[in-house]
């Protein structure tokens, strides 16, 4: 039987809206009664009826007919339920006018949670997912449990790719594996680090108290985990101030463990580019802001390295990315104006030098904002950082107003979508894009809670509802988060470790209408764009995981814990 209910499979916050949908086409298979005559009940795990409600045709400002999934949605709302408990949704007949008669239950959902604890648990799981992506170090059983593994891919003495025409060896130890593969990249690592540093910067007290580290649930705090990647970044800084592009195996690994991969082929440094150098400069300048209270020496190292990289980029503004994708991802970027904006804004937050003003004003003219961050388009870092700094109120005001415009556009798009999301095309990494849009709302919510009568917190949480289960394919897209989580991600560690369960806390890319993996034998549940997700290991187009998708989800969860 198809599941007729679309809801957040993990939970809802007590004081937040609690909206779910039913699909009329699926209900028709269960009853002859029209949807308007059906009722729903919210029932606690002890059997207490907490709420009884009816359905409204459509969803949000949408009429309810979802083009991308061929579903007709009706809305149920149990926001009145504030009691913290585990509960389920029952779809019932014969409630009205049948006093003393137990209603006929047509369908009952799996249990979910009303409470605050689930958000903290998901935050910890997301942060720990980066620990599981660590390269070059042992993952101890006391922290990693059944996913423990020996140190592999030390990368502490590796050569340079032949296309670099460079002799010698380099220490590139540490860092995170990027996604489902064993490459380590500065560009995609940069947007991930920058996003997590924003979370640290904005939620320092609350997040660090939740994620103190040293436990099974949380081996390292958010700042400590990010520092592991930053130390790798610092090793990728060349003597001249340029930053190497990536560490890559010679060829694509099969689905084996890091240990087996390490024995089977060499790993190499590949490329040095303006884009990687500016990603480094922006990330390290942000790191200086985050760590200066706790570790002034490390913050100083970061800022000095950022300055060196920025100077190299000024002298080398058009050094291309290495156009080699044999064994690792490309991350090609032919426009670095947005990275210059990011690097300058981060520098300005540390050192508001007079010489930066005209450059930042020009950056703001030529780098209009996007609805969310992306590894190729990083200008929102510039806008966000300027909105948060207090050195110049004029720049701050302009940045905030600009981001408010983005937030309003996101909410407008959500209101018009059947499922309440703001993307208009399901692409590779759609869950990352949705999470990044939610992050824009969460950041603007820090200084403005409503725009044109629409609450930013409400619409931010609606995006997360999609990620955690309220979607056409009925998956909670984070591994280990719910009964419906992916179990076969396109993730080499999860398939090479001999453990049945995948590494927890990983966000799958999600629905992708382009289906680039059809030749791999992937079977999708339907032909429509909204059904383009398959929990199958070959599905790199929909079921791969990546640190740049986990990072915005982590940041949003951190900001929700802050509030």
Q: What positions do the PLM features span?
A:
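Aromatic (Trp/Tyr) and acidic
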Residues: 5-99, 103, 110, 128-190, ...
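Short beta-strand edge segments in extracellular beta-sheet folds
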Residues: 112-117
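Zinc-dependent metallopeptidase catalytic helix centered on the HExxH motif
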Residues: 371-375
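Hydrophobic, small-residue-rich alpha-helical packing segments that form membrane-like cores
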Residues: 307-311, 317-318
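Extracellular C-terminal loop/segment signatures of secreted glycoproteins
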Residues: 122-127
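HEAT/HEAT-like alpha-solenoid repeats
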Residues: 234, 311-314, 361, 365, ...
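Carboxylate/His-rich catalytic cores and anion/metal-binding grooves
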Residues: 220-242
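Short coil/linker segments at helix-helix boundaries
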Residues: 198-228, 266, 286-303
């Amino acid at each position: 039987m198809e599941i007729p209910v679309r809801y957040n499979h993990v939970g809802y916050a007590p004081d937040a809206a609690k909206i779910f949908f039913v699909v009329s086409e699926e209900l028709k298979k269960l009853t002859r009664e029209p949807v308007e005559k059906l009722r729903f009940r919210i029932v606690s795990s002890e059997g207490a009826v907490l709420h009884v409600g009816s359905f409204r045709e459509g969803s949000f400002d949408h009429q309810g007919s979802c083009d991308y999934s061929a579903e007709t949605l009706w809305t149920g709302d149990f926001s009145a339920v504030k009691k913290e408990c585990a509960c389920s949704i029952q779809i019932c007949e014969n409630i009205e006018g049948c006093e003393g008669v137990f209603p006929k239950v047509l369908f009952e959902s799996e249990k979910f949670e009303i409470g605050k604890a689930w958000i903290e648990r998901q935050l910890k799981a997301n942060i720990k997912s980066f620990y599981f992506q660590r390269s070059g170090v042992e993952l101890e059983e006391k922290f990693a449990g059944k996913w423990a593994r020996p140190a592999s891919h030390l990368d502490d003495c590796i050569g340079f790719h032949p296309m670099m025409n460079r002799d010698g060896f380099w220490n590139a130890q540490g860092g995170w594996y990027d996604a489902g593969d064993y490459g380590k990249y500065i560009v995609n690592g940069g947007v991930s680090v920058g996003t997590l540093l924003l979370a640290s910067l904005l939620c320092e007290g609350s997040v660090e108290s939740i994620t103190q580290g040293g436990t099974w649930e949380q081996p390292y705090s958010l700042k400590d985990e990010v520092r592991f990647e930053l130390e790798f970044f610092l090793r990728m800084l060349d003597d001249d101030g340029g930053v190497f592009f990536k560490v890559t195996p010679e060829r694509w690994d099969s689905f084996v463990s890091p240990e087996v991969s390490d024995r089977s082929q060499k790993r190499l440094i590949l490329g040095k580019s303006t884009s990687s150098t500016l990603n480094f400069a922006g990330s390290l300048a942000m790191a200086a802001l985050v760590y200066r209270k706790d570790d002034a020496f490390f913050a100083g190292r970061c800022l000095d390295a950022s300055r060196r990289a920025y100077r190299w980029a000024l002298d080398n503004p058009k050094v291309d990315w290495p156009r080699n994708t044999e064994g690792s991802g490309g991350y090609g970027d032919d426009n670095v104006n947005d990275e210059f904006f990011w690097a300058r804004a981060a520098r300005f937050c540390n050192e508001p030098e007079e010489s930066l003003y005209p450059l930042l004003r020009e950056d703001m003219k030529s780098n209009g904002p996007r609805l969310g961050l992306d590894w190729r388009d990083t200008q929102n870092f510039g806008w966000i950082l300027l909105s948060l700094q207090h050195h110049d109120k004029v720049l701050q005001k302009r940045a905030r107003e600009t981001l408010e415009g983005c937030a309003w556009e996101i909410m407008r798009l959500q209101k018009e979508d059947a499922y309440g999301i703001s993307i208009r095309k399901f692409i590779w990494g759609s869950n990352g894009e949705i999470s990044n849009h939610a992050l824009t709302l969460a950041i603007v919510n820090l200084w403005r809670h409503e725009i044109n009568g629409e609450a930013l917190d409400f619409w931010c949480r609606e995006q997360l509802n999609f990620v955690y289960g309220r979607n056409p394919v009925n998956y909670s897209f984070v591994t280990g988060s719910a009964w419906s989580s992916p179990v076969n991600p396109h993730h080499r560690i999860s398939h090479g470790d001999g453990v049945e369960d995948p590494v927890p806390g990983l966000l799958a890319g999600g629905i992708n209408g382009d289906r680039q993996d059809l030749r791999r034998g992937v079977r999708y549940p339907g032909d429509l764009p909204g059904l383009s997700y398959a929990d199958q290991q070959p599905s790199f187009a929909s079921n791969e995981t990546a640190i740049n998708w986990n990072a915005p989800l982590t940041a949003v969860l951190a900001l929700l814990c802050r509030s």
